[in-house]
């Protein structure tokens, strides 16, 4: 289950964030941790941010822990990440240790291994105010980071000017936490993002009589639920002409080099019960594009037929998808493109509650 953390700097922001549904708070460097911890009153864990520029990490952790922080996240300096991590190893108290890396450091698996050896339990990629996370890191890089954290027993988290459209994309990777800057987003946008992230309080069971289930909201949270769609009307969402490099082909030489492959996907989506104008009411086409990008960036395929089936299967895991048509074209075979077009409908036996893309890093059935 992915937790939603609110980056806050005052007790007022902490109260507002908890009211909006935050699972935890991360306090800015310099915030009054003792005052915030008293205001929170045990309703959630309090994490404090620290930075090497403000003194010895071990001393900062001790002071912040004494003030009420259960966890301290050290923002690693870009010049000496390894040195900062080793400094964390000097701390031996009860406060849990976490760290934040810049996006360009997220692919350094040696740093991930060092973080684990130095007592860090939670590693985050954070742009640190330098723009949107997904402008710095694509889904494959973030997936690799998540996998590296899992391999070393670390929780993984993402931060960096996150917005509502980022939620379904990042949830595909099943991170342990997403951190949202509450002061930047504001209460309304924060609440919208909260609605897109599943929580332990989310009810996935059938509603009482007269209660309406917002299936589109459930979908954008990354879950599917049983629907008796029958002849329910559908709308078509499409991605056409998406060209990505991948290793594909029956010949060994094809499996060791990248070649361009073009995808066109049309998905018939069960129409929402009401018209909406935000991310809670739509099927995000990023689920399609990011799913293709992840497959292309992480696997080697022999046949276009296999690729088409995998893409169709990924999309059909989404419970609002009634049918999908997938066209896959190899563009570098002889004088013309070659490929396949398949059409698949969601089989009845797939109609249980599940997290989407369960093959990606530990995603599984949610707790009901």
Where do the PLM segments sit?
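C-terminal helical cap(s) of enzyme catalytic domains, especially alpha/beta-barrels
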Residues: 35-39, 88, 134-135, 182-219
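Conserved anion-binding
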Residues: 41-140, 144, 148-155, 212-228
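Alpha-helix N-cap and loop-to-helix initiation/capping positions
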Residues: 9, 27, 31-32, 56-59, ...
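Glycine-rich phosphate-binding active-site loops on the catalytic face of alpha/beta enzymes
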Residues: 23-32, 67-80, 124-131, 173-190
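Catalytic cores of alpha/beta
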Residues: 12-20, 53-67, 106-114, 162-177
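N-terminal, polar/charged subdomain of small-to-medium soluble alpha/beta proteins
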Residues: 199-368
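Active-site beta-loop-alpha junctions enriched in small/polar residues
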Residues: 7-11, 28-30, 49-55, 75-79, ...
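N-terminal basic/disordered segments at the start of proteins
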Residues: 1-26
